[in-house]
Amino acid sequence: MPPAGQDDLDFLKYAMESYVADVNADIGKTTIVFTLREKAGALAETLKLFQAHDVNLSHIESRPSKTHEGCYEVLVEFAEAEDHRKIEGVIEHFQQKAEKKVLVQDWNTKNKQNKDSVPWFPQKINDIDQFANRILSYGAELDADHPGFKDMTYRERRKFFADIAFNFKHGDKIPTITYTDEEIATWRTVYNELTVMYPKNACQEFNYIFPLLQQNCGFGPDRIPQLQDVSDFLKDCTGYTIRPVAGLLSSRDFLAGLAFRVFHSTQYIRHHSAPKYTPEPDICHELLGHVPLFADVEFAQFSQEIGLASLGAPDDVIEKLATLYWFTIEFGICQQDGEKKAYGAGLLSSFGELQYALSDKPEVVDFDPAVCCVTKYPITEYQPKYFLAESFASAKNKLKSWAATINRPFQIRYNAYTQRVEILDKVAALQRLARDIRSDISTLEEALGKVNNLKMK
């Protein structure tokens, strides 16, 4: 029963945790999934909402929620013949009453996207469990032109790594891997050829951090570092963690991980027959290209800003953000002491392109997110154009200014204490933010006062 003094529909704000709505025009059905706290009468009172909007349900099912403790998820379906204005009324009421909004997912009518639609996005770090296994390619399956396609031993090994990733959940420890002599030999070839190039070609931040990885994570030619050791190191440095993944994720899912300072990393290594070539990201690319700079505070923040900008963004913006990621985190160069230096992982894990990118052969232009995000690029050959950043801090500020233009009907912020994304769409949320800002300003003022007192002594 509703609390005293509350009507049936207002009861939802006490009972409902979240909702997801999906209209599939191809099969002529509308689906809404909502999460209810386990309370007597919660489902019955919630279903009255559909009755109030004169919507006839064709299917109902429920199950215990895997992501909300003490709750259960309810799926309801109704036919395409239902008046979409009624459906929109239901969605609008959910938006008003759900305590933790999971906004409308792919809300479309006859393949036309509703102006108020917002794709589903994770709001807490363990929500990543819901999409981490939605890989697009590779994993245990290989294309016919892959160097390891005909090697059944290699393919079995890939399945072993894929199973680890598929069974991983947030909070788990990444299993320790005993790499084979053949795998270590492949790593050694890549490691030895790349590391001699870093002092001259990599950015200062990379060259500062790399020796720390050698000291703390066992980076060296004769041992492939363990992802859990690397994840622990990054956690101490910038709050980033590593999560094993079986293969390529969609741009939306991969960028969503960055929003929570989670980097999805493969554990498998390229085929031994082609140590200088890989058609996909492998552990050499992840550890030698990506990992070092995730330990740098400015770069870590820059990467997270791309992830945060992706949450709830429409598909066209995701494409632009993926392009920004490509030209920065994968193939970015920066200016240091009057020279071009590489900071992109695709460059720092590639023998030939690292030298090519810093030569006079390609076109180099200043980093401008508005231009960068719509620039076409090849995937299977060297880049004809690179974007030059003044610094990570400068690139981050430019990105934030550009991201502010994204048409998203709400603002978000990342709460590092709870590892949640907070939607700033209610007065209470804004008041909490204001209190946090006041507290930080107070801490800053006290620290400045103490520093000034020390100078005067």
Curated annotation (Swiss-Prot):
Signal peptide span: none
Catalytic activity: (6R)-L-erythro-5,6,7,8-tetrahydrobiopterin + L-phenylalanine + O2 = (4aS,6R)-4a-hydroxy-L-erythro-5,6,7,8-tetrahydrobiopterin + L-tyrosine; (6R)-L-erythro-5,6,7,8-tetrahydrobiopterin + L-tryptophan + O2 = 5-hydroxy-L-tryptophan + (4aS,6R)-4a-hydroxy-L-erythro-5,6,7,8-tetrahydrobiopterin
ACT domain span: 31-108
Molecular function (Gene Ontology), one example: iron ion binding
UniProt tissue specificity: Expressed in the seam cells of the lateral hypodermis, in the ventral hypodermis and in the hyp7 hypodermal syncytium, in hypodermal cells in the tail and in body wall muscle cells (at protein level).
Record's keyword terms, sorted: Cytoplasm, Iron, Metal-binding, Monooxygenase, Oxidoreductase, Phenylalanine catabolism
Positions bound to Fe cation: H285, H290, E330
Keyword hit for Metal-binding: yes
Disruption phenotype: Reduced L-phenylalanine hydroxylation. Lack of a yellow-orange pheomelanine-like pigment in the cuticle. Higher cuticle resistance to physical or chemical disintegration factors or oxidizing environments. Increase in superoxide dismutase activity. Increased life span. In a bli-3(e767) mutant background, growth arrest in early larval development, severe cuticle abnormalities with large blisters and increased superoxide dismutase activity. RNAi-mediated knockdown together with fah-1 RNAi partially rescues the impaired growth and fertility defects in the single fah-1 RNAi mutant.
Functional description taken from the UniProt entry: Catalyzes the hydroxylation of L-phenylalanine to L-tyrosine. Catalyzes the hydroxylation of tryptophan to 5-hydroxy-L-tryptophan. Plays a role in the biosynthesis of a melanin-like cuticle pigment.
Family: Belongs to the biopterin-dependent aromatic amino acid hydroxylase family.
Protein name, per record: Phenylalanine-4-hydroxylase
UniProt organism field: Caenorhabditis elegans
Organism placement in taxonomy: Eukaryota, Metazoa, Ecdysozoa, Nematoda, Chromadorea
